Amino acid sequence: MRDRPVTLAAITGAHGVAGEVRLKLFGEGVAALKRYRAFNDSGDGSGLTVVKIKDDGKGGAIARFAEVPDRTAAEKLRGTALTVRRSELPSLPEGEYYHADLIGLPAVSTEGEMLGECIAVENFGAGDVIEIRKADGKKFMVPMKTEAVPEWTDERIVIEAAYADQ
């Protein structure tokens, strides 16, 4: 597991005059964010310390950070991604994955052919789909289902050869 930052939410703007911000969530809702006391902590004191986070009733959240004293400071944070280190995320059961764990992994076929690198994980409603970029720059997508991706580890993604010949 690579211990790089994983984005859980993004600040979309200010909320009110007291320095609260609106958040767009990329995970499992407000409850998943509440387990973290700080975001973007790179060890240099530039992180954001959580004072409170609440559901906004619209699929997002409202947050208050100790370092954001007023609306002006909150507005300057628009577009800021809220990240945590991968090692801070909860462990997952066998067969589950975080999208961040797949991105950047090499992809090989079941026949051992190097296919490229996973550059994205999308979900268009019918389940996750991984996007692979070949060495020549061309891209193809594969459903993240057992028949198409029989195996993945921290080191690689194995794609059924029939799905790689697209």
Curated annotation (Swiss-Prot):
Name used for this protein in its record: Ribosome maturation factor RimM
Disulphide bridges, residue numbers: none
Cellular component GO terms held in the UniProt record: cytoplasm; ribosome
Residue ranges of domain PRC barrel in the record: 94-166
Main subcellular location: cytoplasm
Functional summary from the UniProt entry: An accessory protein needed during the final step in the assembly of 30S ribosomal subunit, possibly for assembly of the head region. Essential for efficient processing of 16S rRNA. May be needed both before and after RbfA during the maturation of 16S rRNA. It has affinity for free ribosomal 30S subunits but not for 70S ribosomes.
UniProt cross-references to HAMAP family, sorted A to Z: Ribosome_mat_RimM
One Gene Ontology molecular-function label: ribosome binding
Annotated source species: Novosphingobium aromaticivorans (strain ATCC 700278 / DSM 12444 / CCUG 56034 / CIP 105152 / NBRC 16084 / F199)
BP-aspect Gene Ontology terms: ribosomal small subunit biogenesis; rRNA processing
The protein's assembly and partners: Binds ribosomal protein uS19.
